[in-house]
Amino acid sequence: MSTTLNENLLLAIPLAPLAGSLIAGLFGNAVGRKGAHRITILGVMIAFLLSAKVFFDVMGGASFNATVYEWMNVGSLKLEVGFLVDSLTAMMMVVVTFVSLMVHVYTIGYMAEEDGYQRFFSYISLFTFSMLMLVMSNNFLQLFFGWEAVGLVSYLLIGFYFTRESAIYANMKAFLVNRVGDFGFLLGIGLLLAFAGSMNYGEVFAKRAELASLHFPGTDWGLLTVACICLFIGAMGKSAQFPLHVWLPDSMEGPTPISALIHAATMVTAGIFMVSRMSPLFELSDTALSFITVIGAITALFMGFLGIVQNDIKRVVAYSTLSQLGYMTVALGVSAYPVAVFHLMTHAFFKALLFLGAGSVIMGMHHDQDMRNMGGLRKYMPITWITSLVGSLALIGTPFFSGFYSKDSIIDAVKLSHLPGSGFAYFAVVASVFVTALYSFRMYFLVFHGEERFRKPKHPESPMGMAATHGHDDHGHGHGHDDHAHEPHETPWVVWVPLVLLAIPSVIIGAIAISPMLFGDFFQHGVAFDKVIFIGENHPALAEMAEEFHGWVGMGLHSVSGLPVWLALAGVVVAWFLYLKRPELPASIRRAFGPIYTLLDNKYYMDKINEVVFARGSVAIGRGLWKEGDVVVIDGLVNGSARFIGWFAGVIRFLQSGYIYHYAFAMIIGMLGLLTLFVTLGGK
């Protein structure tokens, strides 16, 4: 029997981290450093515990879909704050609050000696509040508020080291690129509002058939297709899909804890969640789905290639995020929304683990992020080593780890799809399995195995070996850390405990969740629509997968007969051979394939293209408008009018000679002119 969740309990979930954020931010000096982290952790812990309760209540049949605050009415349009809590929302709430809680605890150790300690805790709690408001919304207005709020807070966090020029450039880049996506997102919302007459999900979904029948006058463009593509452009910005991906690697300029929160559970997952929530609309447009599939495939494969040439440990993990987001997007495109959400969940745990593990390595290495200066750390950082190995195994899709179940399910769904673009997508996601394993275990072997390179002089191109600091996490610099050549060391318990707690779901959550989420009734009983996630009968991939599914054990055992597991193994073996067995080979390969390496090292020149075409292009257009539009036209009208009046006044002044006969002559000429005019007109 369906029951309604308690409204006050739901309100407490986003308000608890908001309260912690406000106290730490506005009264940071009064509460002190300990007070700031205690009050924000308490707020997020309350949100997590209440989210867990809501999750179990929803599993028992409870739900909620109602307005909690009416802001204003504009004609027949209602602007409201409301919550829609179903299985999708409840799962997202648990993931967001749990990962956020781990990041909050981890931050105590990682940011221990930073001057902006209270400010940072305030920001990450505000980030949690923003994401909760986004996933809990039941209308497009609140969705857009949460959407913009996570963008704003990410701007503040990426630019946390605001005295560093590279950080300011990175947060401005993230802000501007996301504005491009948000413009498309706003257009999509505007189209739905204009033709559906409502911002409430349920009311818009109820008119989906009517919307699908509409076309723009004089074109074959379906209204719903255009609206869905516009909505997805918003997702391309938030979830960093090609070509709006360029901001995400530069977000590494922020402290490592926020990198984990952005990449694992908040901002970049917002686009995936939004498209899944809008499945009743997207299912009516194969054109939009094909567009999504191709964009996701490009991102999954080509962003993975960039991870191979990175030397900054955080940037390797960042490019893995881009690639995995591509996987999720491909799943959305082939109508496997539950699989996309499933991978979103498993990815949140192992990606947070990998980022926080990278931060632990950075702390143990006295703030060095260059993997060329590491090696052999497993002896010095055993907990970080084991947990990072767990995260890497989950990332590459090792059988029985969580990432295996979600990633292989995506590959199977793409294989069974018949949408245009699915053939290319299948090639991309399969090839990306090898690429993912290669860059993941390149990182793992360079950091934890092999020669102890930290005993040698720093690599001349690394941030620690030269004056340039681009991409370097300045955590703790100048705040009392002992930066001289000590051996690496394991980090404090407050840092490694979150790693252990994240490692557990990175192993087991896939096996636990695959059956109910993909082949059970987890997404069946909807509130705003018939089903939480709707899949049309013309997209049967998931239904066909269900026929072949024989439990999580059977799936793991059966994987040895499939291509992906062997590609992953091949990637690991190649990484071992190149970076442990024959470490001199990568330099030779780089010289042999110089142009390709240069292309990858310059990130396909996307930053250069954006700078030349958009940045300089905008400046050139602005300069042209200023010179031709402002100076010539506008100033010409204003100054030209003044000059004309001056000239005319000069002419008039010439006529004012002061001689009476001049005036008499003018009067006579005038009278003759008037008489001539009257006679002429009278004759007609």
Locate each region found by the language model.
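N-terminal signal-anchor/start-transfer transmembrane helix
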Residues: P14-N29, L101-M102, M236, A240, ...
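Transmembrane helix-loop-helix hairpins at membrane boundaries of multipass inner-membrane proteins
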Residues: M1-L9, F27-S122, F195-T219, T225, ...
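Hydrophobic alpha-helical membrane-insertion segments
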Residues: G43-V58, G181-A194, S388-I396, P498-F522, ...
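Hydrophobic transmembrane alpha-helices and their helix-loop junctions in integral membrane proteins
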Residues: M102-G146, L152-A485
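Alpha-helical transmembrane segments and their helix-start/interface "positive-inside/aromatic belt" motifs
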Residues: R33-I46, M172-G184, K379-S388, Y444, ...
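Membrane-helix interface motif
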Residues: M59-N65, L193-V204, T398-I410, A511-A541
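Membrane-entry segments of alpha-helical transmembrane domains in multi-pass membrane proteins
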Residues: S2-L15, V31-R38, L42, L77-V95, ...
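Aromatic-capped, Gly/Pro-kinked transmembrane alpha-helices
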Residues: G61, S76, V81, W493, ...
